[in-house]
Regions:
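Carbohydrate-active catalytic/glycan-binding domains of CAZyme proteins
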Residues: 1-123
Length: 123
């Protein structure tokens, strides 16, 4: 999915990847038809845009998934424009118990919401 970043002329594209679990990688561009550049620190299994390697669960919540799958950033508005606010990133995704298996259409996926934690960023 591709989003316009609020207050900029920049676009963000996120794409789901798989190996060894589902996660998201990200690219940016100043033009939808232009060159897309991987977002540093958000472009691999080890350092994903969203994945088990950079997702933490709230205190007291036992980690219940390794998959960050079928996600979408929540938009900054309610019209057809896919604009996101970089200061209020929220990512709705589905995950499942890694011990579950069987028919894909019957897997016990459940929804969750990621929010950007800026507490570890330097001012």
């Amino acid at each position: 999915m591709t989003y316009k970043i609020k207050g900029t002329d920049t676009y963000l594209t996120i794409i789901e990847a798989l190996s060894p679990a589902r996660y998201y990688r990200a690219w940016i561009s100043n033009d939808l038809n232009g060159e897309w550049t991987p977002v540093p620190g958000a472009d691999s299994w080890a350092t994903p845009f969203a994945g088990i390697n950079n997702v933490t669960f709230e205190e007291g919540v036992e980690p219940w998934t390794r998959d960050i799958s079928h996600g979408e950033l929540l938009r900054d508005g309610y019209d057809e424009t896919p604009t996101i606010d970089p200061n209020n990133l929220r990512f709705l995704y589905q995950g499942r118990d890694p011990k579950s298996g069987g028919n894909y259409s019957l897997l016990p996926y459940r929804l969750a919401l990621l929010t950007l934690d800026r507490s570890s960023e330097e001012d």
